[in-house]
Amino acid sequence: MPYSDKMAIESEAPKRCPECHSEHLIRDYEHGELICADCGAVIEDSFIDQGPEWRAFDSDQDERRARTGSPMTYLSHDKGLATEISWSNKDYYGKRIPHKNRAQIYRVRKWHQRIRVSNAAERNLSLALQLLNDIGAKLGIPKDIKETSALIYRKAVEKNLIRGRSIESIVCASIYAACRKVNIPRTLDEIAKASEVNKKKIGKAYRHLAKELDLNLRPTTPFSYIAQFCNKLDLDKQAIVISEDIVRQAMSMGISSGKGPTGIAAAAIYIASVKVGKPRTQKEIARISGVTEVTIRNRYKEISKALNISISE
């Protein structure tokens, strides 16, 4: 990329992370992303893509497949194929637009937005995908998971599965389904907190999508949550290994059958934290796992009795 073009892009980019307000931002031109080095949030993902998303094995194939512009994305209602007009009052080279021309540019932007979103269906899709992006940013999920979420949501729209349900609940259910599809654990509680949508509504919408779209998602296990919960509790690898060993033994004895995976994982971590000399209270673990202290206490009693584990509480 020419130096002047790169400077123009950098001048339009945010200077501060909207999540943690850090100014330590990293520009990844290869992937077209602006990333916060402190919290890991992807602040922008629409920089010019300089590399192809295809492979070519000879020069003829390379010429046939050559293209200009960003690759298609499900995260935009028009799949990223339309032209974008920036809202900053600067031109391509980063120079400020004269005051006498700003009113004209504003009218062009306004009509451009109207043309891009021309009917109610496109307007609703645009709002839903913006919401999906916002929730995804709060959860810290990568772009490929957001793409999968957007694809699931689009399929739900095509099959008219949103009728009678809120857009917010279907968006949240799509994110939850996408996370389960690639085995990236995100609990309903986490998604509910990030979206401010009722947990029960998300669960109901998810079951509706899973059935109607035939998602065939594997059930989650306690192993899916152990590393995530331990990291949030600042527990090391040793605690993770012990927690997984406890869960493995509990599952082999049938203790986990019919029980929620997050509750089993939370109880195992509670035991492991004491064993490694870094005890965490049931209240602390309940807060990060999204299960109640009563659930952790009940699972802990069942596991410790079956495995003959004794710890000083």
UniProtKB/Swiss-Prot annotation:
PANTHER family according to UniProt: TRANSCRIPTION INITIATION FACTOR IIB, TRANSCRIPTION INITIATION FACTOR IIB-RELATED
Binding site for Zn(2+): 17, 20, 36, 39
Zn-finger region bounds: TFIIB-type: 13-44
Pfam families reported in the protein's UniProt record: TFIIB, Zn_Ribbon_TF
Keyword Zinc-finger carried by entry: yes
Stated family: Belongs to the TFIIB family.
Cross-referenced SMART domains: CYCLIN (SM00385)
Protein's recorded name: Transcription initiation factor IIB 2
Gene3D superfamilies xrefs: 1.10.472.170, Cyclin-like (1.10.472.10)
Keyword annotations from UniProtKB, A to Z: Metal-binding, Repeat, Transcription, Transcription regulation, Zinc, Zinc-finger
GO CC, one annotated term: transcription preinitiation complex
Example GO molecular function: DNA-binding transcription factor activity
Biological process, per Gene Ontology: transcription preinitiation complex assembly
Sequence repeat positions: 130-213, 224-305
Species for this entry: Thermoplasma volcanium (strain ATCC 51530 / DSM 4299 / JCM 9571 / NBRC 15438 / GSS1)
Alphabetical list of InterPro entries matching this protein: Cyclin-like_dom, Cyclin-like_sf, TFIIB, TFIIB_arc, TFIIB_CS, TFIIB_cyclin, Znf_TFIIB
PROSITE patterns (UniProt xref): TFIIB, ZF_TFIIB
Role description: Stabilizes TBP binding to an archaeal box-A promoter. Also responsible for recruiting RNA polymerase II to the pre-initiation complex (DNA-TBP-TFIIB).
